[in-house]
Amino acid sequence: MSASPVKAVAIEYGIDVSYDLGWISANESRGLLGIVVAYGRIIPESMLNKTPMINVHFSLLPRWRGAAPVERAILAGDTHTGVCIMEVEPTLDTGDVYARREMELTDAHTSDSLTKDLARLGGDLLVDVLRNGLQVPTPQDGATTYAHKLSSEEGRIDWNSLSVEVSRHVRALRAFTVVDGQRVRVLEVEVLTPSSATVPGEIAPDASVDTADGAVRLVMVHPEGKGPMTGAAWLRGKGFDAPLICE
């Protein structure tokens, strides 16, 4: 197993690397500053008393504190998001903010592509903050929302939702549906023109699926036990002798 880029650089400069938080906490050496990026655990106050820490958080705090800010922003239909460099506290994402940078969140973003964009944005901002030195941070201001941890069952598509909500669901999560008892991952959909006559979950021969206000086309799917394929190819393989329903 190859070392991560961070570990490779640390080894090059003779810096100890550990994945054990207990070892780090017990170590008596004091660093000048700790940097945390997308770290999903609370850091003990005993560690923070030894070494001040800052965190690169993938949202515009206090919106989307918590474990899944990228996915929650897409699901909510946010049109803008960004990154914050914040002071780490023993409580969850409550620290004062040293710097923030905003970006547009488009209908083309998936959780993967948005994470990559935010990582680049956050990396650039972190370099700027470190280069200029930590200034006086600003307390978080505004309405607080929480990006609760995702569950696997949350990926199941509710076809009684609006088409745009189904699209967000697919772009944000490991979305899936069940057809004829088979679990099918939905990788990409296209929102179609709204229609007044729909049966949510019913699949048409053109690989479109009815929603509460219209339909989405299954562009790419990943059926259980097979590889990724187009929605049209998947339907051809199943045949179309009877109406198919996504559950």
Model-assigned labels for residue ranges:
Residues 1-173, 211-217, 223-225, 230-232, ...:
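One-carbon transfer enzymes
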